Amino acid sequence: MQQIKFIDLFSGMSGIRKGFEQACRKQSVACECVFTSEIKPAALEVLKQNYPDEVPYGDITKIETGDIPDFDILLAGFPCQAFSFAGKRLGFEDTRGTLFFDVARILKAKKPKGFILENVEGLVTHDRKDSTQKIGRTLTVILETLEALGYYVSWKVLNAKEFGIPQNRKRIYLTGSLKSKPDLSFETSPSPKLKNILESGLPTESSPFIKKLLKKFPPSELYGKSVKDKRGGKNNIHSWDIELKGAVTEEEKQLLNILLKERRKKNGLQKIGIDWMDGMPLTKAQISTFYKHPDLQNILDSLTDKGYLVLEHPKQKIGGQRIKDESLPKGYNIVSGKKSFEINKILDPNDVAPTLFAMDMEHLFVVDNGGLRTLTGKEGLRLFGYPDDYPFDIPKKDRCDLLGNTVAVPVIKAVSERLLHTL
């Protein structure tokens, strides 16, 4: 039986390792992880639970290549970081100061047979000059660096929902071999439904917010609904729809629904000397051009007192940030944004989950037992293709953080199989 040694960098929950090991087992290839690197405490605890006989190394930037055992395959899910270009393109040296540099320096020193890298979809266009470019400078330098090291490199954006996972999660996968280019063309399968991985009959949560929500909407009508004030659409619920901050009249509700759209338009903003921003506060005079009501000021005052609106100065864009410009008159703006409520979205069991991010995981709910609850740890693992028996005994907040940053294990398995064919 063939024996393959591999290393796992930026290991996180070891999702890339899991997928690679599954591919090896499927192809009757013996494999051994000879080196793991991770620095996040919660991830280290999970690694300890899963691999009690192993001791992960710490910060990869501080580890000399001579201290890393020889290996055949490098696995890494590295962060997306821009490179610094000063004058002449230097290839490998252009990557210095980023974590990809450490991936490259290890590949250069150890010359393994191949590698698998995973990153966010945004890496494809990261740091490009304009929209006419297919890929940005960051990915260009990465590919040039890997090819200069002698690897035949393939890359592709793949979606987890096409590999048996009920989550719409696109990521870029790069894989390379010293012998030949791995084939990353796959036959996709129909997306499974979220209900296939959900548990049932579990305790639900109760809070003033949830009580108000369920008072206005039966659970079955909440499937796929988002809760945020600064966007519209049929799948969105606003705080005023459930009277979260106090009762609203029909006139007040009508104004709020119109205002949330008008505040995003560019009309007339140049006249007040400000660049357009997504969500501009509008003065009473501006509002009166699209909402004519004899009692407009009282309506605005009422909504401001209840907390649905805020009276604030417009903001100028300065150094990449929005800073309020007190030289301009105050206007009325919607108060609550996407992350203002304990619920961000109620998942639709008959659909796939949206892309799951660390910051959103705690605010995703499902309908169960006539009420609402958050995802369980087991459901979270299933949404990324981890086995049910995967040890994951850490606080909920840490679970959400690790899951939001992990990989879809079945996609890694599929990519790994293609790499193994080239060895």
Curated annotation (Swiss-Prot):
Residues 4-423 form the SAM-dependent MTase C5-type domain. GO terms for molecular function: DNA (cytosine-5-)-methyltransferase activity; DNA binding. Pfam families: DNA_methylase. GO terms for biological process: DNA restriction-modification system; methylation. The active site is at C80. It comes from the Bacteria. Keywords: DNA-binding, Methyltransferase, Restriction system, S-adenosyl-L-methionine, Transferase. SUPFAM superfamilies: S-adenosyl-L-methionine-dependent methyltransferases. Its EC number is 2.1.1.37. It is an enzyme of class 2 (transferase). InterPro entries: C5-MTase, C5_DNA_meth_AS, C5_MeTfrase, SAM-dependent_MTases_sf. It catalyses: a 2'-deoxycytidine in DNA + S-adenosyl-L-methionine = a 5-methyl-2'-deoxycytidine in DNA + S-adenosyl-L-homocysteine + H(+). Signal peptide: none annotated. Belongs to the class I-like SAM-binding methyltransferase superfamily. C5-methyltransferase family. This is Type II methyltransferase M.NgoBV. It comes from Neisseria gonorrhoeae.
